Amino acid sequence: MKKFDNLGLDNIKEIFHNLSYDELNAHEKVNNEGLSTDNDTFCVDTGIFTGRSPKDKYFVKQDPSSKYIAWGKVNQPITKELFDKLLTKAKQELSGKKIYVQDAFCGASLQSRKAVRFVTEIAWQAHFVKNMFIRPSQEELENFKADFIVYNACKCINEDYKQDGLNSEVFVIFNVEENIAVIGGTWYGGEMKKGIFSMMNYWLPLENKLSMHCSANVGEKGDVALFFGLSGTGKTTLSTDPKRKLIGDDEHGWDDEGVFNFEGGCYAKTINLDPEHEPEIYGAIKRNALLENVVLRADKSVDYADASKTENTRVSYPIEHIENHEPSLKAGHPKNIIFLSADAFGILPPVSKLSKEQAMYYFLSGYTAKVAGTERGITEPQATFSACFGEPFMPLHPTVYARLLGEKIEKYEVNVYLVNTGWSGGSYGVGKRMSIKATRACINAILDGSITKCEFENFEVFDLAIPKALEGVESTLLNPINTWSDKNAYTETRDKLAHMFVQNFKRYEDVKEGIEFSKFGPKI
């Protein structure tokens, strides 16, 4: 117990330190924390919070970190006094209890990883941490020194939130100087995952290393590909390839040795999960996996189509559950970077080659378009821009990440492409969704290098280089203007989308670099 004195908890009944999967499973059952499914996967309910609470996330405003953090709606400030008050409250909640302490690494690169200690009173949350982060060896555990501590007091709420000037009784707070995070009021496991991701996005760029919200895989010849894309763009599907090993599906770093996964597991959506279309994920759901907010049938089988608790049903599992993964969780420098956008306006080409400067522009834009249904059944695509394809998790000014990306693209001579997995031949409602076959053909041409031998032409207004012909893709598809029957509607929609890009980018022009990068977007 003595080695846990620095946690600041009183009268702890018992500490369960780095339990095995079997031990955690036994505790989950004894504590009545959930149910076992027909194939012995444990299943929990995260309560009223079935997703992250971005409006309840804060950073303590103090020097020196305050001069690096980009304060605003994403990174909200909180005072040191209020942090101390809520940390004390969280520690009181965890005191006098049996607690679980789970130690893990974030980052598969020895030079870049961080050692994180998680403290919770819930066995399944320790299980989630064990699944999602990198599991230290026995020797590493014996010499473990935490760089950062997360207190997860999910049962603790802040009743005084109104007088404290906060958004709700939930709080997720990061103190960079003290290397502590405290979570209260939400049971959602993803807060721990994305919380440490946010911290990696603070630490690494200040060490001149890039942190990225992307998936990564590696080919038989050691060629690495990164896939960036917002939800619904096909990132998981397209980075899963029988001929390539998965490095990771969500969070990566890029240091002077190459690309490395931050995590030791995957956190996959399970709504409408189908063994035929997503056999890898389906096959990964077995003992040691942890299901969240799914509905069980009477025979304890999972009804993946049931969204009665939430659309955001999830499963976490150790990456070893994916057969075709890269065991070291790292590889060399990328050969190709692919930005995925599901453009529901039907304007972006199926594939475009980007210059280094354009890559920085489209990385900062982080564009996709969602289809939003309205009450009267009229559907109008909604443009979504998320800086660096992961804005909610980026504490620094987005241009910091873009500059690092540009430097690495240049240094390691990386090819960058923009791939549209969205609509063609018209906007949503008129055009049709790009076939997965055509998209796969574009991805394959990028990965096998054949696209570099193509003849390219200019795609007007957006000033993108697009191939004139590509094996496996109808030539008419390659330039969107050829797929629209109504050319006036095409021109109008193209100009409208270009204008959205330009308007969105104005928010980066508060710094010199942003003004510089803005020159590489659409010309209107």
From Swiss-Prot:
Q: Which residues bind ATP?
A: K194, H213, G229, L230, S231, G232, T233, G234, K235, T236, T237, E278, R314, T439
Question: Which EC numbers does the record give?
Answer: 4.1.1.49
Q: Kindly report the protein's main subcellular placement as a broad class.
A: cytoplasm
Pathway assigned to this chain's UniProt record: Carbohydrate biosynthesis; gluconeogenesis
Report the GO terms under cellular component. Answer: cytosol
Q: Which GO terms describe its biological process?
A: gluconeogenesis
- Binding site residues for substrate: R52, Y188, K194, R314
Q: Kindly indicate whether the keyword Lyase belongs to this entry.
A: yes
Domain of life here?
Answer: Bacteria
> For Mn(2+), which residues are the binding ones?
K194, H213, D250
Q: Name one GO molecular function term.
A: metal ion binding
Q: Reaction catalysed by this chain?
A: oxaloacetate + ATP = phosphoenolpyruvate + ADP + CO2
Name which cysteines form disulfide bonds. none
The cross-references to InterPro entries, in alphabetical order and at most eight, read: PEP_carboxykinase_ATP, PEP_carboxykinase_C, PEP_carboxykinase_N, PEPCK_ATP_CS
The reply on keyword Signal is no
Query: What's noted on cofactor binding?
Result: Binds 1 Mn(2+) ion per subunit.
| Keyword terms of this UniProt record | ATP-binding, Cytoplasm, Decarboxylase, Gluconeogenesis, Lyase, Manganese, Metal-binding, Nucleotide-binding
Obligatory cofactor(s) = Mn(2+)
Where it sits in the cell: the answer is: Cytoplasm
Family indicated by similarity? Belongs to the phosphoenolpyruvate carboxykinase (ATP) family.
Reported function: Involved in the gluconeogenesis. Catalyzes the conversion of oxaloacetate (OAA) to phosphoenolpyruvate (PEP) through direct phosphoryl transfer between the nucleoside triphosphate and OAA.
Name this protein carries in UniProt: Phosphoenolpyruvate carboxykinase (ATP)
Q: Name the gene behind this protein.
A: pckA
